Amino acid sequence: MTNESHRPSGIKDYAALALSTFGVGYIPGAPGTYGSIIGLAIYLFLGMHLAEAAEHGRSIGTQSAFISAFHFAVIAIVLAIFVFAGIWASGRSTEIFGTDDPHEAVVDEVMGQIITFLFIPFTMSWKLLLTGFILFRLFDIWKPYPINTLQQLPKGLGICADDILAAVYAGVCLSIIYAVTLM
């Protein structure tokens, strides 16, 4: 469905465009893949900085359980911000671009990658990073049931909900692969 698009006007429209596209939504080719790369980069950035903080915590005698809980809490808070702001920005982008699911809006792929990697401990293993990346992209593109039905939800919720569930599917598969590699 195509609606009438309009030029962005005001700070809210520009904020929605910046958040929903991360700038990469305008690159021709595969904006969803580019958005996924941004999500993976954010995961790595957070993970590396949290790993440094964890090392410092261990050096001053902080318990490992507290460090793990803190690590997870920070990523969960960042993810929650992405989800709520992403749903708002994606919804706003439908009005700006005049379509129900503008390909320029990639915040859903960003949050999808972050969710995918919540299912395993932080890793720098390129094999696991590539596997998680590919699994999310496959589920996001394939959209098996009930992922495909979530796109029917209104505006930003419909744009983001299918990617959130695709990330859960990918995360479960990734955690199984991770567990098997530990055996």
Predicted regions and their residues:
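Interhelical loop and helix-boundary elements at the membrane-water interface
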Residues: 2-37, 87-116, 137-169
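Residue-level signature of transmembrane alpha-helical entry/exit and packing/kink sites
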Residues: 13, 17, 36, 67, ...
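Interfacial segments of multi-pass membrane proteins
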Residues: 20, 38-51, 114-121, 174
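Short Lys/Arg-rich amphipathic alpha-helical segments
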Residues: 27-46, 74, 82
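Membrane-interface interhelical connector segments
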Residues: 52-68
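Hydrophobic core of alpha-helical transmembrane segments in multi-pass integral membrane proteins
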Residues: 75-86, 175
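Transmembrane helix interruption/hinge and helix-loop junction motifs
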Residues: 120-127, 183
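Juxtamembrane boundary at the C-terminal end of a transmembrane helix
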Residues: 175-183
